[in-house]
Design a protein with these regions (language model features):
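Catalytic alpha/beta core domains of metabolic enzymes, predominantly
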Residues: 134-150, 154-155, 176-325, 431-438, ...
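Short helix-loop-beta junction
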Residues: 61, 371-375, 622-630
């Protein structure tokens, strides 16, 4: 079993990371305060009127902290006029000066703003892309040089009562860090901690840290490693979360939701910014959508509705995870055959979606299957398995009629059918589905429950059909509920019992899925428990029912993206009321953001700021219009040299 430093209190149960409170002007950050929402202006900082107008627009949208770039002394000095005009208009939002390359601008900005952001990769270093082997003495000399450049800012911020963000960017690590640690999360963390240690030597502690990357996986790993390293060193500074250069549209929101939401799920993060290549005001509703469920827990910590499902009612040790939170490794699983589709093992994570009309409506169901399985344009991704729901004998008759019509419609997509095990148990022959999805009767005593499972599994095995056990808290059988309660642990023990019974009757193609609201904790516990029992059954990761586009986009991305970045999941399903095209697009955008399946061109574009000397939004649109056909290609569209050569 891998022994790694802990990055959070408990991977199976939400508890916010404890931090000190750092005040950004009148806005307290960290501790038990809500997750703060912030953004950054894209106007020219020398254009006072435009920057003031944009700041007011952000504040009216709900932005709590506004960052403004100060690339030179001129912009740093103009922050005084911007702040004065905002105060004249009754706007007291905290301002943050964004500094790269120019310590003199940071020293001037400290006189006017509530926080200064510096990048440890370029505050005292210039990027030369030089390869050099540093001895320990040479490296120490470099740290002393950096301290000499950085100390004046630390002392001035301390004198003025101004906070600092030490913000590492994956794309702008110094040559010194790159040569010793490489382009890695470890390098990102050490880059920041070097500056934190200097601050602490001068008894300055109003510090916020960030570990931004355009790749959500790298960003997640870096923040986790930072949390673990800081815990080891007795540091408790709050974190600013964000995926840099996330892009625009749905893709940018999905990347941000996965990166930021994965960390918030573990209680990590105190302020967030959703970086979009759009007008800055569009970032605010996206940020609130991500933060809302976590701030709701903070607002009502003792209310049952605000708490996740209990992990366990027992004092027994919880299972040890085999996943490495600081590096990606997909959970090993058996490969199963579902009709013509292979799932698990080395197969790509598959996309399964459900129809939303009753099965009795054969015409409507057929139309939805066609919409889900037919590419919108040549080469476009499609749903790889369509999920149907049957609750009665009449539904099974409708399913048989539907099957007869598929060849004439030119449809061959594998179908999965969800039905009660009692209904399956009563059938003389199985429906012609690639996979049957069911759960046994939880009210049966242990012996009859085992017999029902064995009969159903044996029937499935004889017909060569795949089997998925789908579990909710209500499906935990009473004899297991007595031991484990209606808990995540109860779900995991129910799943392992079902898989073991299937092995007894030699069912080769078995999967497990869960349908419970704390999806991340539940699937993590399930995977850890199954692995501890030597059961490499594939996992179908699905969301609970999500209604409306906002919930599907943000909550679906957070839950599924977190699990996929943890290496969990062999197929995925968003349970939503989205139209077919939108559900397919969102599913593949999640897979692409998690770096698991590339289905289109990957655009990495920064959100623009006062440094940008051209219209980044229209430029991005123009490049996309000409290059979106280049599947498997990554294209970076950058507004300046901060995160690029």
């Amino acid at each position: 079993m891998i022994t790694l430093p802990a990055y959070c209190h408990d991977p199976f149960s939400y508890r916010r990371r404890k931090t000190r409170v750092v005040s950004i002007g009148d806005v307290p950050l960290g501790g038990d305060y809500p997750i703060r929402i912030q953004s950054m202006t894209i106007s020219d900082t020398m254009d006072t009127a435009a920057t003031v107008a944009e700041t007011i627009q952000l504040v009216e949208a709900g932005c709590e902290i506004v960052r403004i770039t100060a690339p030179s002394l001129n912009e740093a000095e103009n922050l005084r006029h911007i702040k004065a005009e905002l105060h004249r208009r009754g706007i007291r939002v905290p301002l943050v000066a964004d500094i790269h390359f120019t310590p003199n601008a940071a020293l001037k900005a400290a006189e006017y703003v509530e926080k200064v952001r510096i990048n440890p990769g370029n505050y005292a270093d210039k990027k030369k892309f030089a390869t050099r082997e540093y001895s320990d003495n040479e490296y120490q000399a470099e740290l002393e040089r950096i301290e000499a450049r950085f100390k004046p800012l630390v002392l001035k911020l301390k004198q003025y009562g101004v906070a600092m963000r030490i913000g590492t960017n994956h794309g702008s690590l110094s040559d010194r860090i790159m040569n010793r640690f490489g382009d890695t999360p470890e390098g990102m963390v050490e880059s920041a901690l070097e500056f934190v240690r200097i601050c602490e030597r001068y008894d300055y502690h109003d510090i916020v840290l960030s570990m931004k990357a355009s790749n959500p996986l790298v960003m997640i790993q870096a923040y986790r490693l930072l949390a673990a390293r800081m815990a080891e060193e007795g540091m408790d500074y709050p974190f600013h979360l964000g995926v840099t250069e996330a892009g625009d549209g749905e893709e940018g929101r999905v990347k941000s939701a996965i990166g930021i939401g994965s960390l918030l799920e573990d209680g990590i993060g105190d302020t967030i910014r959703v970086s979009l290549t759009e007008d800055s005001v569009h970032e605010i509703p996206a940020a609130y959508a991500i933060a809302k469920p976590y701030n709701a827990r903070l607002a009502a910590p003792n209310q049952k509705a605000s708490l996740p499902v209990c992990v366990s009612t027992r004092t027994a040790p919880l299972p040890q995870e085999s996943r490495n939170p600081y590096g990606y490794r997909r959970r090993p699983s058996d490969e199963v055959r579902l009709g013509d589709l292979q799932v698990g093992g080395a197969q790509p994570v598959r996309v399964e979606l459900a129809t939303t009309v009753p099965l009795a409506d054969v015409d409507g169901t057929l139309a939805q299957i066609q919409a889900l399985s037919t590419p919108a344009q040549p080469g476009a991704p499609v749903c790889e398995m369509v999920r149907l729901q049957a609750t009665s004998g009449a539904d099974l008759e409708a399913f048989a009629r539907l099957r007869q019509r598929l060849p004439a419609a030119g449809l061959s997509v594998p179908l999965s059918l969800c039905l009660p095990l009692a209904l399956l148990d009563s059938l003389p022959t199985l429906p012609e589905a690639a996979k049957l999805i069911t759960a046994p009767d939880p009210l049966l005593p242990e012996g009859p429950w085992h017999e029902q499972v064995r009969r159903g599994a044996a029937l499935v095995a004889r017909h060569g059909v795949g089997l998925e056990w789908t579990l909710r808290l209500e499906t935990i059988p009473h004899f297991l509920r007595a031991a484990y309660g209606a808990t995540i642990e109860g779900l995991a023990y129910t799943a392992s019992r079902l898989v073991e019974l299937c092995r007894e009757v030699a069912v080769p193609d078995v999967m497990v899925s869960l349908d419970t609201a704390p999806a991340v904790a539940a699937y993590r516990f399930l995977a850890a428990h199954l692995d501890s029992q030597g059961l490499a059954v594939p996992l179908h990761v699905k969301t609970p029912a999500l209604r409306g586009r906002t919930a599907a986009l943000f909550q679906g991305s957070i839950w599924l993206g977190t699990l996929l970045c943890d290496g969990l999941g062999d197929s995925l399903q968003i349970d939503s009321d989205l139209p077919a095209a939108e559900a397919i697009s969102l599913s593949y955008n999640i897979l692409q953001a998690a770096r698991l399946r590339m289905s289109k061109t990957e655009f990495i574009s920064c959100p623009s700021c006062g440094r940008t000397l051209f219209n980044l939004q229209t430029t991005t649109e123009r490049i996309k219009s000409r290059m979106s056909h280049l599947k498997d290609v990554k294209i970076a569209i950058m507004g300046c040299i901060v995160n690029g050569p």
